[in-house]
Regions:
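A short helix-breaking turn/cap at a secondary-structure junction
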Residues: 120-185
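Residues forming well-ordered secondary-structure scaffolds
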Residues: 33-37, 87, 117, 148-151, ...
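Structural signature of FAD isoalloxazine-binding scaffolds in flavoprotein oxidoreductases
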Residues: 111-116
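A generic signature of intrinsically disordered, low-complexity regions enriched in glycine/proline
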Residues: 15, 78-81, 109, 146, ...
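Gly/Ser-rich catalytic/binding loops embedded in alpha/beta enzyme cores
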Residues: 1-106
Length: 185
């Protein structure tokens, strides 16, 4: 379902063989040993990783700034923030540099950048998407989709969602979001 679509992946998600710093200067040379479940599902569905996106150090801020990358700017107005901690994804989508993006949310880290950047983000309920091995693995962190439209977020969420054999917290059965709403007038 994602064949050939450009995907922006938040830097906290590891991809085997590629750098993943979680926005931290001490981790700037870290190379992923495994690919997170979310990224793996997107790749298996045909998405093409187009960008790695900025995040504040260890995804712990409502705006994106690090000693590693500096300040991430909102493409609609460079004096404004794209929010955080998935602000790099929000800015990438708002600039039109990718069609889809990954984020994660504890206290607004998908919702804040979506609002600041004029894109759509969805924090799924805990257990809908497998956690994998992101840095701040805990019960409050929910990986989720971001895109420029509700339809694209639903499409990406349907790819991300579902049980995973290595995450016992994933909810069964898989819940699928409808991609068409014919009964709504």
């Amino acid at each position: 379902p994602l064949e050939g679509l450009a995907l922006a992946i938040k830097d906290e998600e590891t991809i085997k063989g590629l750098p993943a710093s979680s926005g931290s200067l001490p981790l700037k040379d870290y190379i992923g040993e495994e690919t997170t479940f979310i990224a793996e599902r997107c790749f298996n569905a045909g998405a093409i990783m187009h960008a790695r996106t900025t995040t504040p150090e260890f995804s712990c801020a409502g705006f994106c700034h690090t000693k590693l990358w500096g300040v991430t700017r909102n493409p609609w107005n460079l004096d404004y923030t794209p929010g955080g901690s998935s602000g790099g994804t929000g800015a990438t989508l708002a600039a039109g540099a990718a069609t889809l993006g990954t984020g994660s949310d504890i206290g607004g880290s998908i919702r804040i950048p979506a609002s600041c950047s004029g894109v759509v983000g969805f924090k799924p309920p805990y257990g809908r998407n497998p956690q994998g091995h992101i840095f701040n693995l805990d019960f409050y962190c929910h990986p989720g989709p971001m895109a420029r439209s509700v339809a694209d977020v639903a499409l990406l969420q349907n790819v991300m969602a579902g049980p995973h054999s290595r995450d016992i917290a994933t909810v069964k059965p898989k819940m699928v979001l409808p991609l068409e709403y014919k009964s709504i007038k």
